[in-house]
Regions:
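Flexible beta->alpha loop and helix N-cap segments adjacent to enzyme active/binding sites
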Residues: 1-91, 96, 181-182, 186-294
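Phosphate-binding glycine-rich loops and adjacent basic patches that engage nucleotide phosphates
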Residues: 2-5, 116-126, 176-179
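Hydrophobic alpha-helical scaffolding
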Residues: 29-33, 136, 140, 144, ...
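A contiguous, well-structured pocket-lining segment that forms one wall/lid of small-molecule binding clefts
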Residues: 58-171, 184-192, 196, 225
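Short glycine-rich phosphate-binding loop at a beta-alpha junction
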Residues: 169-178, 274
Length: 294
């Protein structure tokens, strides 16, 4: 389990044994000070092609997925691997030590090592004071290559941390926590586990706080069969306002199935739709009852 932080740490490993008595089924085998989520997402502040998000808490939820996508457009620069590895290790922490307060220093040092400028706003009258300057962000190959190299460092750090335990226990693997939503890393781990030990890798999809609550309940109830929580989220909270929204925005409401052809034609014309139906997903999803299609 590795993510942006929890009550018991940032990077934890457990050995599960459901045959043992309940109080002995879970054994802690890894307690690491390694924090890979925050240094990974923090680089998003400096990438021009990613919409700027000022709030740190919101940025933690927004930047990571977009950075993973951007990594595919860049190339790993071998000479940047060591400086970025050093940058990641500066975020190592114990408990809630707010190392992110030192991020400007981390970025300045990284910039000197790799020859890039990470510009901050030091105007104390600006809302961006002490944050990345929104008008001076990285573009082009420098931006894409930085994120591609960061993705490699991220993968190497996590894989090297958990590989000894995979090799020792030779069993199925469960990945959880926000960082476990990085499908590039998940694929690397799954390929290794499957090829070397012919075991399976399960990635918990509900890595947000809803998963924590569910885990506590399931640990207490111990259901005999796995519950289907795919769409166990909230209903559309403002669905009663739909017609009012249409009137406010002067939008047309389609209620005849034959008019869906209009939607199809618009999609073929590269227009984008937001799809909202039923209850929401239990945890973050790229597609489902809350989707952007185009």
């Amino acid at each position: 389990s590795y993510d942006g932080g929890g009550d018991d740490g940032w990077f934890m490993g457990y050995k599960m044994d459901k045959v043992s008595p309940k109080d002995k089924q879970m054994k802690t085998i890894l307690y690491s000070l390694l924090d890979v989520g925050n240094p990974y997402m923090y680089l998003g502040y400096f990438i021009h092609d990613i919409n700027y998000v000022l709030d740190y808490g919101e940025a933690c939820l927004v930047y990571a997925g977009k950075l993973m996508g951007l990594a595919g457009y860049g190339k790993v620069r071998d000479e940047w691997v060591e400086p970025l590895t050093d940058y990641y290790h500066k975020w190592n922490r114990e408990g809630y030590n707010p190392v992110e307060n030192n991020a400007p220093g981390y970025m300045e040092e990284l910039g000197k090592k790799i020859g890039l400028s990470f510009v901050y706003c030091w105007d104390d009258m600006s809302e961006f004071y002490e944050h990345a300057h929104p008008e001076h962000r990285l573009k082009g190959d420098d931006a894409a290559d930085l994120i591609a190299t960061s993705q490699k460092v991220f993968e190497d750090l996590v894989f090297n941390e958990i590989k000894p335990f995979i090799d020792e226990y030779k069993t199925n693997v469960c990945l959880t926590g926000g960082c476990a939503l990085n499908i590039l890393l998940n694929s690397k781990i799954r390929k290794y586990v499957k090829k070397k030990y012919n075991k399976e890798v399960y990635v918990a999809p509900n890595s947000s706080d809803c998963g924590l609550a569910t885990g506590l309940i399931l640990d207490y109830v111990r259901p005999s069969t796995p519950p289907d929580l795919t769409y166990a989220g909230e209903d559309v909270i403002d669905k009663d306002m739909f017609f009012s929204y249409c009137d406010m925005k002067n939008q047309k409401y389609y209620n005849d199935p034959t008019e869906l052809k209009t939607v199809a034609d618009n999609l073929r014309s590269s227009k984008i739709y937001g799809l909202v139906q039923g209850t929401s997903e239990h945890g973050p999803r790229a597609l489902g009852n809350r989707s952007l299609i185009g």
